[in-house]
C-alpha cells in the first residue's frame, strides 16, 4: 500500500466474512489512509460454511463479574460459532410479513436456509442428514467401491505417508492469500495523526465496529472512526475525544464496543463512552478517571474473561489491576527495577506476563 506504515490492528473474528473464507483481516494505518487487508483461504465452493477453517471463538459476553473473578471464579468466556445461521440474533418483525415472529423453542435448524445446516445436520454435502437422504443402489455400489477399492485414489501411498511423517501435518491455511481490499472500503484523508505515541503502545486500536486514533493536536485529542462508514473524511475538523493530556496508550473494552480506556502522560486513565452510532460531537467529559500511578503510564490491557478488570503499567515501576466498577486499583504489583516494555494476560485470564528492559519476563 501507499505510504509508511504507522500501525497495525486485527479485526475481531466475529467481524470476518466467513462465507468468503476470510480467516484474518488486518487494518494498516499509514500517513493518510486506513487500509483493510483481507486474508482468504481459496476454496472451490463459497456456498457453504467451511467449519475446518472457523473453529468456535470466544464471544462478547464476560464469563464473570469483577467481584466473582476476585473471589476465584474460573469460568471462561462462552464460545460462539462463526456460522452465520448459528449466531445469536435479535427478534425481527416486519410490517411487510404479517404474522412473522421469532421462534425461540424451534427444533434445531428450523427455518434455516439450506445452505446453513443445523448442528445435527453434518452430512458430507452439508445439505441433508443421513436419515433423510436416499441413494440409488447404483450410486451406493459406486460409493462402496470407491471407498474400498485398491485404486480409489483416497488412500495415501507409502511414499506419501513417509513424507507426511517427516514434514508433519500440513496447515489448512497454507494457501491463504492476503489482498488489499477495494478502495471503497478504505478510510482516506486522515490528517494530523500523532507521531509521538510511545513505542510501548500499538499506536491505535480497533474493535469490530470502530477504530480510535490519537491525533497530533494539543490536549491529547483522539478521533473515533466507524468501520461501517468508509470513504474520504471531510477536510473540515471531525468530532474528537478531548483527553486533556497526551495519549500514552489506549484500548477497547472487549465486552463493550463503546467503552474506550485511554492512558495519559499525566498518570491517569480515563474511560470514555462512545455514543451509539459513533461520535457526532466532541467529547470533553470522561465516564470515569482512574488515579493511582505517580508517573506516566506505559500500557493498559482489559481482562479477557472478567468484566470491568483493567491492568496498567507505569514509569513508577508498578503494575496495577483496577476494578472499574469501584473506580480504584485493588492490587499493586511491585518488584520491577527497570522499564516495563509490555504486558499481556493469558487467554484464560489466570496469569499476567510483563516484559522489562532488564531482560526478564515476569
Residue ranges of predicted features:
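Blade-loop segments of beta-propeller domains
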Residues: 231-260, 286-288, 295
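Acidic and/or Ser/Thr-rich intrinsically disordered tails and linkers
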Residues: 15-233
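Loop/turn segments within WD40 beta-propeller blades
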Residues: 204-208, 251-257, 300-307, 344-349
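Conserved strand-to-loop turn within each blade of WD40 beta-propeller repeats
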Residues: 215-217, 263-266, 312-316, 355-358
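WD40-repeat beta-propellers
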Residues: 1, 11, 27, 222-226, ...
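WD40/WD-repeat beta-propeller blade N-cap
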Residues: 2-3, 194-196, 241-247, 290-297, ...
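Short C-terminal beta-strands that terminate individual repeats in beta-propeller domains
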Residues: 237-242, 279-292, 313, 329-335, ...
Amino acid at each position: 500500500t501507499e505510504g509508511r506504515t504507522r500501525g497495525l490492528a486485527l479485526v475481531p473474528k466475529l467481524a470476518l466474512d466467513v462465507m468468503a473464507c476470510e480467516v484474518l483481516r488486518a487494518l494498516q494505518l499509514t500517513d493518510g489512509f486506513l487500509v483493510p487487508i483481507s486474508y482468504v483461504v481459496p476454496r472451490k465452493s463459497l456456498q457453504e460454511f467451511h467449519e475446518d477453517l472457523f473453529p468456535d471463538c470466544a464471544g462478547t459476553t464476560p464469563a464473570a463479574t469483577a467481584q466473582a473473578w476476585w473471589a476465584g471464579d474460573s469460568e471462561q468466556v462462552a464460545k460462539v460459532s462463526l456460522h452465520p445461521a448459528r449466531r445469536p440474533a435479535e427478534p425481527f418483525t416486519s410490517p411487510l410479513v404479517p404474522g412473522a415472529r421469532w421462534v425461540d423453542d424451534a427444533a434445531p435448524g428450523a427455518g434455516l436456509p439450506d445452505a446453513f445446516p443445523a448442528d445435527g445436520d453434518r452430512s458430507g454435502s452439508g445439505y441433508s442428514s443421513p436419515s433423510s437422504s436416499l441413494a440409488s443402489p447404483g450410486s451406493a455400489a459406486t460409493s462402496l467401491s470407491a471407498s474400498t477399492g485398491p485404486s480409489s485414489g483416497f488412500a495415501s501411498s507409502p511414499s506419501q505417508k513417509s513424507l507426511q511423517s517427516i514434514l508433519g501435518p500440513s496447515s489448512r491455511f497454507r494457501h491463504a492469500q492476503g489482498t488489499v481490499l477495494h478502495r471503497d472500503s478504505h478510510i482516506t484523508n486522515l490528517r494530523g495523526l500523532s507521531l509521538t505515541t510511545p513505542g510501548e503502545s500499538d499506536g491505535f486500536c480497533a474493535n469490530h465496529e470502530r477504530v480510535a486514533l490519537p491525533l497530533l493536536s494539543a490536549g491529547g485529542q483522539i478521533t473515533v472512526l466507524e468501520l461501517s462508514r468508509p470513504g474520504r473524511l471531510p477536510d473540515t475538523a471531525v468530532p474528537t475525544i478531548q483527553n486533556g493530556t497526551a495519549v500514552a496508550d489506549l484500548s477497547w473494552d472487549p465486552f463493550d464496543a463503546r467503552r474506550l480506556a485511554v492512558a495519559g502522560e499525566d498518570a491517569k486513565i480515563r474511560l470514555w463512552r462512545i455514543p451509539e452510532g459513533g461520535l457526532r460531537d466532541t467529547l470533553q467529559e470522561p465516564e470515569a478517571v482512574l488515579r493511582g500511578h505517580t508517573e506516566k503510564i506505559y500500557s493498559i490491557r482489559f481482562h479477557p474473561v472478567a468484566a470491568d478488570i483493567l491492568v496498567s503499567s507505569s514509569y513508577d515501576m508498578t503494575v496495577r489491576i483496577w476494578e472499574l466498577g469501584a473506580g480504584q486499583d485493588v492490587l499493586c504489583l511491585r518488584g520491577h527495577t527497570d522499564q516495563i516494555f509490555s504486558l499481556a494476560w493469558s487467554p484464560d485470564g489466570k496469569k499476567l506476563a510483563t516484559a522489562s528492559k532488564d531482560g526478564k519476563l515476569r
